[in-house]
């Protein structure tokens, strides 16, 4: 199995881990202990009711909201990277630079998620988070460029 495919699996695993370890544990611990009802988690209010949302923010400084957003960032970017991997596989492209770009992309994704969840949204934290997001975008654009060059040859 090549590195971009392994990174894709790692990206998917990280997305699921973020869901289960952060959002899932948080929600289910409150439901199982009877602090909220299952109906509290409505689809039109991702963090629960307005009253409950204010209580959460007061208790956790928005940790749950940041975890939810970090998970959604993973979900939003996973298909983009998956499309790149499909194109790489279809064209049979493999190189050390592609492998390194893939690994850097996943490392940047993991750090961006951790910064997003663990640090309150200050200018410094947001800039740091954006830097790791930008690193991912650069890696994916570079891999896309390699694919485009191979197509044009």
Summary of predicted features, one role per range:
Residues 143-153:
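Juxtamembrane boundary at the C-terminal end of a transmembrane helix
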Residues 84-107:
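Short alpha-helical packing/oligomerization segments
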Residues 13, 71, 103-107, 131, ...:
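Hydrophobic residues within alpha-helical transmembrane segments
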């Amino acid at each position: 199995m090549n590195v971009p495919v392994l990174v894709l699996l790692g990206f998917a695993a990280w997305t699921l881990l973020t869901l289960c370890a952060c959002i899932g544990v948080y929600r289910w611990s409150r439901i199982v202990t009877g602090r909220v009802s299952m109906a509290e988690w409505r689809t039109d209010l991702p963090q629960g009711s307005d009253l409950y949302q204010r209580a959460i923010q007061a208790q956790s400084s928005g940790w749950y909201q940041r975890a939810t957003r970090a998970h959604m960032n993973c979900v939003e970017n996973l298909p983009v990277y998956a499309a790149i991997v499909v194109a790489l596989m279809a064209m049979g492209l493999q190189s050390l630079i592609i492998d390194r770009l893939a690994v850097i992309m996943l490392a940047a994704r993991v750090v961006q998620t951790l910064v997003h969840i663990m640090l309150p949204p200050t200018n410094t934290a947001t800039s740091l988070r954006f830097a790791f997001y930008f690193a991912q975008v650069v890696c994916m654009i570079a891999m896309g460029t390699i694919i485009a060059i191979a197509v044009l040859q």
